[in-house]
Design a protein with these regions (language model features):
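An exposed, glycine/acidic-rich loop-and-rim segment of catalytic or binding clefts
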Residues: 1-262
Length: 262
């Protein structure tokens, strides 16, 4: 696992916490109290900080042949977050459905912020060297709205319609079809790196969020979540590092669908 532990891409297919995505200037106010976090992404805190959940050793317990439970206790003040947070994460492989199910539970003894997600990077074409681009992947996202970002990838506070913009994946489009358009949001993110506001049947329901089809292999991945949003990230900042089996990963050679709050 050296390629994971020593990876220059620290969030490669890891569990993200306490808080997935960026917190502006590493600060937030909760019930009138300001909390300062570790800065690790320009002026911001990203994915829980440099030693967030992705960098922690979790306790593991195999509950069944296809089920593993992980537990971690994040101490009060870790990376600046308040409260002792007990986290339980279960990975379950459903062979008949050809599905990987990830479940999270967290409890705290003090008011805090939590936004857990999985930062899986996918290339459905399979392993080769260099890893092929994901720009030919055909993506559909069940979302009529998204959250625009500024030049340092912080949400502006708006919730904008995707209709009539390159952000619209309500019908199938390849990733590369519009990714280089002179559209300010794609310039800000160096590609797609945005939260999509999912069309939910009801709050907390398990719904289809996104579909990704790789035409050369014929592989399709469906993403379901109970969360309100999903972050589409097209590997814009991958820099050619070496991963498993000697494969290298240049920019836009992997795609992420990060289920999350927003």
């Amino acid at each position: 696992i050296d390629h994971v532990v020593n990876s220059p891409e620290p969030f490669l297919s890891t569990t993200i916490g306490r808080y997935g995505n960026r917190i502006a200037k590493g600060k937030f106010t909760l019930y009138g109290e300001e909390h300062e976090l570790t800065i690790n992404n320009g002026p911001n805190s990203l994915h829980g900080g440099p030693t967030g959940f992705h960098a922690r050793v979790w306790d593991a317990d195999q509950l069944a042949e296809n089920i593993i439970q992980f537990n971690y206790v994040s101490a009060d003040g870790e990376e600046g977050f308040p409260g002792n947070l007990e986290v339980e994460m279960v990975y379950r492989l459903e062979e008949e459905e050809n599905a990987l199910v990830i479940e999270y539970r967290a409890t705290t003894d003090k008011a805090t912020v939590v936004n857990l997600t999985n930062h899986g990077f996918f290339n459905l074409a399979g392993i080769s060297n260099p890893t092929p681009t994901i720009e030919n992947n055909i993506v559909t996202i069940n979302a009529n709205f998204y959250t625009p970002i500024d030049e340092v990838s912080i949400p502006t506070g708006e919730v904008a319609k995707v209709e009539g913009t390159p952000m619209d994946f309500t019908t199938p489009h390849t990733v590369g079809e519009r990714i280089n358009d002179k559209f300010q949001q794609l310039i800000n993110g160096a590609g797609y790196d945005h939260c999509y506001v999912l069309n939910k049947i009801e709050t907390g329901s398990l719904d289809l969020a996104a579909t990704c089809f790789e035409p050369n292999s014929g592989r399709t991945m469906e993403v379901y979540t109970t969360e309100a949003g999903v972050q589409l990230y097209t590997g814009n900042w991958l820099n050619g590092f070496e991963g498993a089996h000697g494969a290298t990963f240049p920019a836009r050679s992997a795609i992420c669908f990060e289920a999350q709050c927003f």
